[in-house]
Each structure stands twice: as structure tokens, then as C-alpha cells.
């Protein structure tokens, strides 16, 4: 047996001193080790900063991650609260089971792990947390397409694999402000709750209103009569942009920020579908079992007649490495493609004799 002990970053002093920082680095100055790319706010940083603020008000809040302190934005939390921060190393199963134990004893564990790595702890989420209805806040970083992080890190499946678990509540913010709102809601909740958010920064689209978070309640961002656009997470910005483009083309779109996929705001969504009889869903994840599937099932369960319906998301396949914009273009998730679909759909003469038209 040969036991080889390695040192991350060996031979390059800046990497030896900051192994987490150099885990997945972009171009940097080789003399100083500093990144050449200007650091901007991203979802991970906003999450970490907000958690520090909440933890200062509530000493029951603890943070857990699996070897990704810096990547998940918990660097400052670890410095501020060293006795309330737990890095369990590459042991996601242990992270969730430990969180369950902490919740059982009255603490409020906030677990931050990448979407693709939550898969490793699926059994623990089901049996250690959700079966017992324990208050564990599961923050799902790198949800959706992650671009240059690569194929193994694409966070395609979290909405689908979490949505089938009883007792869990699942949210996704449209921007930084809504992430802060959802995190505050989650730490004051009582039960298993998950927040998914993407890699990188928020979209350029700015939202004028941010209603308070209410469990299972969607947000109508724009009322319309011709088509219902239901989106979740980062795709809400895309939905808003699409609605503006369609308005200039004479098509009146209603935009709904789902906010929650579980519980789903059935009342708001049903009213919208009955009004427009034309609905599309947009999500940053697999369409198999995600938001689109949930809406499709709702249409069938409620026996809504004469509805045109289309899901926009990622297909039943593994998504290769590539820039986010390129991947969205390949799979038809661009504003241009979705606008063209709605235009064609609006022009069609559809047989509306008691038919659900799923395209």
C-alpha cells in the first residue's frame, strides 16, 4: 500500500495559501495570483452576505457546506462565526444528516451545496429531513446551466428530483433582492425548504416591484390576454423581456413569476390559463419533471379545455460543456426563438373542440 499525501497548489505559493480560491480559477496574474477579471456580485456572494446579516440577529443559525466554503459564498460567515460554520469536506450525505440532527435540537441549519452534488445526498434529504419534517434550509447553488464549470456540474435535475418528495417547499428567486427575501423567509419557516439559484450574477433586467414572500404564492409581473408566460428563477427576466418584445408586435402577454414550484400557486395559474388559453413555461433545468411538467399536469388535472401549451427548458439528455449563451441557443432558450414560437402560435387557427394541444 502506497499512501501519497498531496498538497493542493503545490509549487505555486498563491495557490498553496489559497487552495479554495484556485479550485476553479479564471485567468490571473502569475506574480500576485490575483484574478484579471473584475469581481462582480453573484448569487453566491449575495447569499453569503445575507446569511451573515440574518445570523447576527439569530444565534440559532448555523451554516454547513461540503468543501466549498468560498464557492458557495460562505467565506465571511466562517470568519464571523467560526463556531457556527461547518465544512464537512466532500461528504454531502454527512452534511445533510448532520443538518437534520442540528434541526432536531433546535438549531437552524443552512446547507449550501452545488445542485449537482445534492444528488449524492438524496436519501438523506428524503429520510433524515423530509420524513421528519425538519427545519433544514437547503440552498442549491449552481442550479441550472453552469457554463464553463462543465458537464458534470450542470444543475439540471434539482427541481425534478426534489419536487416528488413530500413535505418539502421549493423556491427560486428571479434576482438578488428576491434571493434575500427568500432566505429570510426560509430561516423563519418551519420545515424542509429549498432555494435554488444559478451560477453568476443576476440578469440585466430590472424589476420595479418585489412583493413579500408568501408560501405557495406566485407573482404576476404583467397582466395580459393573449398568452401566459410562466417562468421561475433566472428565467423570469427572460420572460419579462419576451413580453416587452411581444407587446411591440401587438401580442399581449401575461408574465407570472412562479416563485414556488412546490407548493404551486394553482389558483393564480389556472385563472391565467383560462383567460389566455395559451401558455408557455420557461425554466433553467430539465423539462422532465420540472416546472413545465407540473403545469402540464395541472392543465390535465383541472380538465382545462382548448389550451395551447409549450415547455421551454432542457431536454432529456446530459448537457455538454459550453458558455451559457451558447447552450441556451442550442436548445432554443433564447428570447428570439421563444418570441418566434409565440408569433407562429398566435397566427395558427387552432381546432378548439375540447382539445388540449401540447406542442
Regions found by a protein language model. Give the residues of each.
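Short beta->alpha connector loops at strand-helix junctions that form conserved
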Residues: 88-89, 113-114, 172-175, 282-284
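Internal gly/pro-rich beta-alpha loop/helix module
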Residues: 148-165, 172, 176-187
Amino acid at each position: 500500500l502506497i499512501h501519497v499525501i498531496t498538497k493542493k497548489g503545490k509549487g505555486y505559493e498563491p495557490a498553496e495559501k489559497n487552495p479554495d480560491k484556485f479550485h476553479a480559477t479564471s485567468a490571473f496574474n502569475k506574480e500576485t495570483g490575483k484574478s484579471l477579471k473584475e469581481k462582480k456580485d453573484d448569487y453566491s456572494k449575495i447569499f453569503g452576505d445575507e446569511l451573515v446579516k440574518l445570523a447576527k440577529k439569530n444565534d440559532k443559525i448555523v451554516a454547513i457546506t461540503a468543501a466549498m466554503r468560498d464557492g458557495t459564498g460562505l467565506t465571511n460567515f466562517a470568519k464571523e462565526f467560526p463556531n457556527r460554520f461547518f465544512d464537512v469536506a466532500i461528504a454531502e450525505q454527512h452534511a445533510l444528516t448532520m443538518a437534520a440532527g442540528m434541526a432536531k435540537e433546535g438549531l437552524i441549519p443552512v446547507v449550501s451545496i452545488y445542485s449537482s452534488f445534492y444528488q449524492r445526498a438524496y436519501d438523506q434529504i428524503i429520510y433524515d429531513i423530509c420524513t421528519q419534517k425538519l427545519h433544514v434550509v437547503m440552498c442549491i447553488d449552481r442550479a441550472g446551466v453552469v457554463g464553463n464549470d462543465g458537464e458534470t456540474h450542470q444543475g439540471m435535475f434539482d427541481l425534478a428530483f426534489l419536487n416528488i418528495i413530500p413535505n418539502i417547499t421549493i423556491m427560486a428567486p428571479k434576482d438578488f433582492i428576491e434571493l434575500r427575501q427568500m432566505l429570510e423567509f426560509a430561516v423563519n419557516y418551519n420545515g424542509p425548504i429549498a432555494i435554488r439559484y444559478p451560477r453568476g450574477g443576476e440578469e440585466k433586467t430590472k424589476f420595479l416591484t418585489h412583493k413579500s414572500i408568501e408560501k405557495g404564492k406566485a407573482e404576476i409581473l404583467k397582466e395580459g390576454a393573449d398568452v401566459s408566460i410562466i417562468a421561475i428563477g433566472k428565467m423570469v427576466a427572460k420572460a419579462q423581456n419576451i413580453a416587452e418584445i411581444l407587446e411591440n408586435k401587438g401580442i399581449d402577454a401575461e408574465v407570472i413569476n412562479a416563485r414556488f414550484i412546490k407548493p404551486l400557486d394553482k389558483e393564480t395559474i389556472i385563472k391565467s390559463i383560462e383567460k389566455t388559453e395559451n401558455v408557455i413555461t420557461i425554466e433553467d433545468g430539465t423539462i422532465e419533471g420540472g416546472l413545465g411538467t407540473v403545469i402540464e399536469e395541472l392543465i390535465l388535472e383541472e380538465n382545462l379545455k382548448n389550451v395551447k401549451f409549450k415547455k421551454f427548458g432542457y431536454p432529456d439528455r446530459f448537457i455538454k460543456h459550453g458558455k451559457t449563451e451558447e447552450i441556451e441557443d442550442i436548445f432554443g432558450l433564447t428570447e428570439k426563438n421563444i418570441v418566434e414560437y409565440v408569433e407562429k402560435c398566435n397566427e395558427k387557427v387552432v381546432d378548439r373542440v375540447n382539445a388540449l394541444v401540447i406542442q
